[in-house]
Amino acid sequence: VSRFGASSLDVLENEPERLTEIPGITEKKAREMSESFRRQSGIRRLIEFLTAHRLPPELAVRLYRVYGELATDALRDDPYVLTDPYFHADFSLVDAFALELDVAADDERRVEAGILFELSYNLSNGHTFIPQPKLCAATAALLNLDTETIEAGLLRLTEQNRLVVDTVAGLQA
């Protein structure tokens, strides 16, 4: 701070090579300091973004590991990435966030995330099998959509090999 004054943070973030003007700071050390500062600043901005949208700040570190500086852009592009098990985000919070960002109620990403959430929810409650009509009805109720929209989402998930539908005891599940 004594060397660069009020522009210290700007130098640290945007002109790290100038840090070598300080005795004892090598180019390598200057790069490391700058990278650390940018990472911490990025996480801080991400936490501010998450909390402004009523999402838990604990998501910030995992999001930053996956997306880096592009984390907020990734969330704006597809908020349902948070429904990936890696993030452990509550579906209702993610869904409210997505709708806040003007994602359409019948958006394919929302429908598919809702189906996968219902499957995960049932599995966590000990159900290893759910008849397709029951899955579609439960997801339709969760998302407040018609079952035809859910069935179309289910078909997309199977075509993408993200889900397997099988017939057991005469029931598609």
Pin down the residues of each PLM region:
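Accessory alpha-helical DNA-binding modules that contact the DNA backbone or grooves
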Residues: 1-170
